[in-house]
Amino acid sequence: MLGPSGCGKTTTLRMIAGFEDLDGGEIKVGDKLLSSKKNNFYLPPEKRNFGMVFQAFAVWPHMTVYDNVAFPLKLKNISAQEIEKRTTDALRHTNLLSVAKKSPDDLSGGGKQRVALARALAINPDVMLLDEPLSSLDPHLREEMRFEIKALQKKFGFSIIYVTHDQSEAMALSDRIMVMKKGAVQQIDTPLNIYNN
């Protein structure tokens, strides 16, 4: 989702996540109904199996990097061995295994976003929702993280809904772009077609 600040990107993402109510219509992922105003149906966020990464570095400073990533798994009915496996795998895939015992406060901004990404990855999501996750990083780190996000998506095959106001970020990361302005969808197309039109 691409558009200027205040155009409704984050609100739309929050509706997809289940954090906001719909005014009308419905939300589906594939054939799975998530929300429907007409049918008065609402699937709670914890049952949607979505990984979420916010713009702010959403990490718990009183927990280690490992515990930050393992935390959502501990809320599910998952064995200790499975929690350890998934957490270790997520840390490995985000290049955080060597800092697993450190505090997130010991990491750079990019490191903190990797922790949030690893936490979202550990739940084996059907869809990843990313709300301007790179906007507070310096340009060099932002570009590096773009490649990492794209590589993770290709490796695991989950869909990503990515919110940004940065056109180059949208062009580099997307298979399809939805352009928004003043709360309305202006265009949905491939990056190339949007660039050419």
Model feature map: region roles:
Residues 2-4:
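The feature captures the beta-strand-to-loop junction immediately N-terminal to the Walker
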Residues 7:
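ATP-binding Walker
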Residues 10-13, 115:
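ABC ATPase nucleotide-binding domain helices that frame the ATP-binding cleft
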Residues 17:
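Helix-to-loop junction immediately C-terminal to a conserved catalytic motif
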Residues 20-21, 28, 74:
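A position-specific signal in ABC ATPase nucleotide-binding domains
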Residues 23-26, 182:
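Conserved coupling/switch loops of ABC nucleotide-binding domains, chiefly the family-specific signature
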Residues 25-37:
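Conserved ABC transporter NBD signature motif
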Residues 49-51, 55, 59-197:
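ABC ATPase nucleotide-binding domains
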